[in-house]
């Protein structure tokens, strides 16, 4: 079997036939970390290292595992030396998804079919840089070539959304770039919580005297995002918690923290529970899809964190007790308050996949006719792999309805990451193809092909009500 040919990752005849239904579908990338300013300015990339390795902690993590010095990863080594160091790493990375993604990016974006190795690294480095300049490769070109119709960025609640506004006014660019409301700093354990309170007060003209003042100010920002085309929120929790508190307790806690008090574990849980519930009520009011990423233990290597900051490849998947108990309480609390928005839950630890899918199935009832009102999101981060994707789809198929799944997202900082949609589609087609080959479903290529197309694109469009 040939590596990275037209049948890459398509493991059976049924998969190859199903893939014809999805291979030319556009991309609806509803969650990523691209910078809207870069999209608007649309500068031509001059060096492949900036485009391919810069900010990519997946690659940095691999390079450290291969004994590469930090100088050649995030330091001041030359661009060529960094590229060679990555090539030296990549040729030993069989089995890691970065190996597959990189090969697909080289072939499908740049037309380079050779396997990148240390021996040919300099030649390919020069060819890639020549390609960038001759073809004027820029963010918008990469987006257009990948047929991306929608991009959901990740944005601070106090962002001016200046660059989203400029993109919306630019009629020469057809892709919609919408902000996503990401209020990490609204949670009391965040190191910048006090600073966020001050800036929120300045932005809204509201004093943060009581809990209700804080929520009112947050609504002002949510309304502003809605006015600027926002369709979703996002949050990242280390753990899913549920710990009820009286409003008087929250008022007292807010006052103490403003005076420099460090909250204890119980108070952190109480604040998270209360704030998230209030935000969900607002998200429902404003029609935001609520995305919940959970289970990441971040910044574990303290020296690298102090030197380089966050998102540099030193994070892990976590575990927790009472996950389903807390999830059920949290979701039921929202139901009781008529505050349950459409939600996508992304679980980082695959050992919880069945439990999460099973819990979400308890709360699908809605009078709006929404299919899978609560979504079990695609394999995230360390689960964004072949086995991770299959594990997530298995759990969803067994506990819910895979046919209603909103499918893949890049969750990436790289303009080359759209190849991950194709990677997912190939794995999806093999997964569905195995059902056909093993006689688990009827050999109905029209029905299964329609299902694959829905998962690849149309379900997300409908779920986010993209027009």
Swiss-Prot record:
Top enzyme category: isomerase
GO MF term set: glucuronate isomerase activity
Pathway connected to this protein: Carbohydrate metabolism; pentose and glucuronate interconversion
Keyword entries, A-Z: Isomerase
Pfam families, sorted: UxaC (PF02614)
EC number: 5.3.1.12
GO BP, one annotated term: D-glucuronate catabolic process
Positions of transmembrane segments: none
Reaction catalysis annotation: D-glucuronate = D-fructuronate; aldehydo-D-galacturonate = keto-D-tagaturonate
UniProt xrefs under SUPFAM superfamilies: Metallo-dependent hydrolases (SSF51556)
PANTHER family for this protein: URONATE ISOMERASE
NCBIfam families xrefs: PRK02925.1
Family of this protein: Belongs to the metallo-dependent hydrolases superfamily. Uronate isomerase family.
Protein name: Uronate isomerase
Organism: Streptococcus uberis (strain ATCC BAA-854 / 0140J)
Upper lineage: Bacteria, Bacillati, Bacillota, Bacilli, Lactobacillales
């Amino acid at each position: 079997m040939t590596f990275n040919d037209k049948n890459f990752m398509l493991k059976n005849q049924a998969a190859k036939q199903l893939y014809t239904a999805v291979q030319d579908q556009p991309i609806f990338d509803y969650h990523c970390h691209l910078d809207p300013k870069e999209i608007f300015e649309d500068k031509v990339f001059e060096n492949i290292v900036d485009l391919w390795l810069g900010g990519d902690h997946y690659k940095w993590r691999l390079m450290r595992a291969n004994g590469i010095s930090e100088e050649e990863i995030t330091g001041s080594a030359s661009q060529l030396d960094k590229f060679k160091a990555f090539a030296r790493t990549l040729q030993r990375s069989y089995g890691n998804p970065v190996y597959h993604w990189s090969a697909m990016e080289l072939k499908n974006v740049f037309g380079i079919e050779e396997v990148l190795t240390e021996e040919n690294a300099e030649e390919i480095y020069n060819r890639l840089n020549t390609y960038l300049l001759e073809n004027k490769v820029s963010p918008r070109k990469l987006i257009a070539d990948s047929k991306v119709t929608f991009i959901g960025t990740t944005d601070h609640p106090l962002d001016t959304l200046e660059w989203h506004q400029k993109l919306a006014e630019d009629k020469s660019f057809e892709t919609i770039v919408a902000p996503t409301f990401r209020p990490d700093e609204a949670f009391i354990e965040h190191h910048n919580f006090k600073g966020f309170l001050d800036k929120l007060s300045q932005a809204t003209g509201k004093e943060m005297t009581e809990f209700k003042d804080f929520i009112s100010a947050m609504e002002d920002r949510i309304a502003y995002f809605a006015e600027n085309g926002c369709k979703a929120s996002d949050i990242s929790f280390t753990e899913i918690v549920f710990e009820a508190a009286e409003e008087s307790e929250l008022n007292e806690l807010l006052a103490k923290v403003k005076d420099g008090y460090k909250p204890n574990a119980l108070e952190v849980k109480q604040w998270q529970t209360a704030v998230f519930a209030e935000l969900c009520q607002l998200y429902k009011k404003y029609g935001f899809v609520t995305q919940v990423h959970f289970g990441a233990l971040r910044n574990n290597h303290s020296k690298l964190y102090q030197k380089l900051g966050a998102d540099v490849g030193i994070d892990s998947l976590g575990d927790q007790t009472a996950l389903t108990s807390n999830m059920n309480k949290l979701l039921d609390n929202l139901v009781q308050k008529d505050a349950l928005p459409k939600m996508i839950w992304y679980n980082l630890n695959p050992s919880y996949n069945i439990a999460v899918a099973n819990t979400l199935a308890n709360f699908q009832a809605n009078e709006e006719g929404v299919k899978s009102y609560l979504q079990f999101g695609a394999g995230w981060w360390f689960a964004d792999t072949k086995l991770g994707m299959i594990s997530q789809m298995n759990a969803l198929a067994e506990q819910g309805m895979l046919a209603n799944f909103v499918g893949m997202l890049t969750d990436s900082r790289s303009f080359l990451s759209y190849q991950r949609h194709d990677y997912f589609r190939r794995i999806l087609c093999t997964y569905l193809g195995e059902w056909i080959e093993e006689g688990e479903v009827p050999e109905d290529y029209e029905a299964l092909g329609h299902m694959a197309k829905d998962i690849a694109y149309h379900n997300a469009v409908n779920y986010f009500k993209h027009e």
